[in-house]
């Protein structure tokens, strides 16, 4: 396994489709493994492309201004619980509501359990339980709706490896919650911990940009080189090629860049603004 730390080289690899991601175990029958095998993050080629298109279609239905307003409202209501609890719960709950989950306020706890397992896929009974609950909530929230399914017919690869009892969109909706928990919650908490957060003259956008550049919530990702070498890409390493500040790689780069960057920033900005206004 090779560590890649220089940001220019990390960006080059992220932008090169010849570098694949490690794929999930599509043969496993564990619920968390089946979920992992049904998302875009751990798929390559045409399967990844189909799932990515569907993720983008789901996100296109979420108005970022409405999302920010909901995040601000939930933050105000949860303010007595403290900033850490707000950061852990609000991003997942407001996104779950917009994505049509049944009982969105109950989603943060199982999402946290599944997110702990998500990057590695190591066997986890709590993750299996959480995956079962979340997939059921994703389905239940849509069983009486006319959901738009453009690009997700049975032959597009969206549901490959998931199982016949899991519709094509449920795993992708859960994927968005899991990745929001890991990235957006961490972004909020880190921004609020910055000393500059206590200075009302410093815009929230500057706080978020600082965290994303210098201390991204998700600091590593993995790729498989064309020669089979396993690579660990560090998103927070040095950037000797940049004449000014280091480039920001928190949302990735290239064809697998985070599809929900605007949504994450809308939620984080609203939450941090509300907490700082206290």
Please state what every model-predicted region is.
Residues 1-278:
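Cytochrome P450
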